[in-house]
């Protein structure tokens, strides 16, 4: 019944609205800019935004592409006006938000704002529930072009489940914004309210519909705020991990948002700051800085304006880097770029320097060819033929762009196939096929050619559905060796339509079950869009 209801709801939504993915020109590349929340929280005002705009225009951030200035929570009064419209806090914004919008636009920025889908914002200010059309018109009248819609204080109504209530409200906002003469960029925070459950079915379900309604979605926990307790690096790694689980959703017009860049957080080393930026760029994620911009160091401005990495982030393919391999300390991520080159990012999660020798085949490249590898941090280049040898400091990320003799490479989608709930890797060798903790190595790295999955440990053999069992057999092109990857994260067999299932081989496909949702390498065709 759940699956039937969702199918009907999805079909109705597609008939009633124009999906954001069908209008990628609204936001053809991920947004870059500034938001006050992680650095200042509710301590925002006109002076902060004027000083931020002035500093970004002077220090090169605006010229580098950081052109959004977005207010977060607490900008409004605690009560609506007699006509039910929202009002800005005149103590914080004495000249008003229309004036502020005009000021930042005159400098070359665009203007964004925050609201909440519930009856109150997270900070206790008026939410938009019941006032959606009025608030949308108000924002447009003020010159707002971007709406971040949070999801605090959303309660089920009309017999809906919590997930259905969120879809109802965010779908309503999408219809309103899409019907405006100049639609606003729509940032959805709905998935974050389902991310920390042991049963991820509702989170997966919300992630299924947010690309239809908005241009980006905050999919998980908030990044650690400046005044917060705990490890800023650990917070970055939590959001990094969540982002690796949802690569299948991203494409031009919709972007997974792992939250703000925090370059002036006192708990981060320079390597950690650069990793944060470099990984987000590798993901083609939004690059929204939350920091005291006038106080950023020259070194911070230097890496934040790295032209090569910004070009990666803004690449028109918008392909998200995915895991080529993973072991106890090191993640290797790859993606293809629009110019035909291959991006390789190597993250050291461990607490000491490591060296890795990474075979080109792990990266989806041909070990018989020569490549030029450009280090995107310092611009140095080296020739690579058989493997990439790299030394990576603790919590650092090395990033390379591989090109062939004609500037392009013929990459094959290659990487781990992992269960996004357990984190375990599909593992195949002469001993059989199953799931195990990810430890790196050829038996956990798969080539995806068309509909076939082949482990690098046995490239002549294909993942095969033997009834409910999995095996490796010589590739013969029959239905039992054909697999299709779906937006739900299901990997479906061409033989009787069962789904890959951790712990059960192949089983009947359920509704967004933890055991049946998988991450695959970038470049694999995703059905269901």
Swiss-Prot record:
GO biological process, one term: carbohydrate metabolic process
GO molecular function: alpha-galactosidase activity; carbohydrate binding
Entry EC number(s): 3.2.1.22
Start and end residues of each Ricin B-type lectin domain: 408-528
Active site: 150, 208
SMART domains to which the protein is assigned, alphabetical: RICIN
Places the protein is found: Secreted
Keyword field: Disulfide bond, Glycoprotein, Glycosidase, Hydrolase, Lectin, Secreted, Signal
Pfam families: Melibiase_2, Melibiase_C, Ricin_B_lectin
Highest taxon listed in the record's lineage: Eukaryota
GO cellular component: extracellular region
Annotated family: Belongs to the glycosyl hydrolase 27 family.
Name this protein carries in UniProt: Probable alpha-galactosidase A
Source species of the chain: Aspergillus terreus (strain NIH 2624 / FGSC A1156)
Gene: aglA
């Amino acid at each position: 019944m759940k699956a039937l209801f969702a199918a009907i709801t999805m079909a109705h939504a597609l008939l009633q609205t124009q999906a954001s993915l069908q209008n990628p020109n609204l936001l053809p590349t991920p947004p870059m800019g500034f938001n006050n929340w992680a650095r200042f929280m509710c301590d925002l005002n006109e002076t902060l935004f004027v000083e931020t705009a002035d500093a970004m225009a002077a220090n090169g951030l605006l010229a580098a592409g950081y052109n959004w200035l977005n207010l977060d929570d607490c900008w409004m009064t605690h009560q609506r006006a007699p006509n039910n419209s929202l009002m800005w806090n005149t103590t914080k914004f004495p000249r008003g938000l229309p004036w502020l919008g005009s000021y930042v636009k005159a400098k070359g920025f665009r203007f964004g704002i925050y609201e909440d889908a519930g009856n109150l914002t997270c900070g206790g200010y008026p939410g938009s529930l019941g006032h959606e059309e009025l608030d949308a018109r108000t924002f447009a009248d003020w010159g707002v072009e971007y709406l971040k819609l949070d999801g605090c204080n959303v309660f089920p109504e009309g017999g809906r489940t919590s997930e259905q209530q969120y879809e109802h409200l965010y779908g309503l906002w999408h219809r309103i914004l899409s019907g405006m003469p100049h639609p606003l960029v729509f940032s959805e925070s709905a998935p974050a309210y389902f991310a920390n459950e042991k049963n991820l079915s509702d989170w997966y379900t919300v992630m299924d519909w947010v690309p239809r309604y908005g241009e980006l979605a905050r999919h998980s926990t908030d990044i650690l705020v400046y005044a917060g307790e705990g490890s800023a690096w650990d917070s970055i790694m939590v959001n990094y991990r969540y982002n690796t689980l949802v690569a299948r959703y991203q494409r031009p017009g919709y972007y997974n948002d792992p939250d703000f860049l925090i370059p002036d957080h006192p708990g981060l080393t320079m390597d950690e700051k650069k990793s944060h930026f470099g990984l987000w760029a590798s993901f083609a994620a939004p690059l929204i800085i939350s920091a005291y911009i006038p106080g950023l160091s020259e070194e911070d401005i230097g890496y934040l304006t790295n032209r090569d990495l910004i070009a990666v982030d803004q690449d028109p393919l918008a392909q998200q880097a995915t895991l080529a391999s993973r072991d106890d300390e090191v993640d290797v991520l790859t993606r293809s770029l629009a110019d035909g080159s291959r991006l390789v990012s190597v993250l050291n999660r461990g607490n000491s320097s490591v060296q890795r020798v990474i075979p080109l085949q792990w990266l989806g490249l041909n070990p018989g060819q020569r490549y030029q590898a450009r280090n995107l941090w310092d611009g140095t280049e080296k020739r690579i033929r058989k493997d990439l040898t790299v030394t990576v400091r603790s919590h650092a990320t090395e990033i390379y762009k591989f090109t062939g003799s004609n500037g392009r490479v013929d990459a094959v989608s290659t990487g781990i196939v992992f269960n996004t709930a357990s984190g375990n890797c599909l593992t195949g060798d002469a001993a059989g096929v199953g799931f195990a903790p990810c430890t790196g190595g050829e038996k956990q790295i798969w080539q995806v050619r068309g509909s076939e999955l082949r482990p690098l440990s046995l490239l002549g053999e294909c993942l095969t559905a033997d009834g409910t069992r999995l095996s490796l057999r010589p590739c013969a092109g029959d239905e039992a060796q054909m697999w299709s990857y779906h937006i739900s994260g299901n990997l479906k067999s061409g033989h009787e339509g069962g789904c890959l299932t951790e712990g059960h081989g192949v089983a009947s496909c359920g509704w967004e079950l933890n055991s049946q949702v998988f991450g695959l390498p970038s470049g694999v065709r995703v059905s269901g869009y």
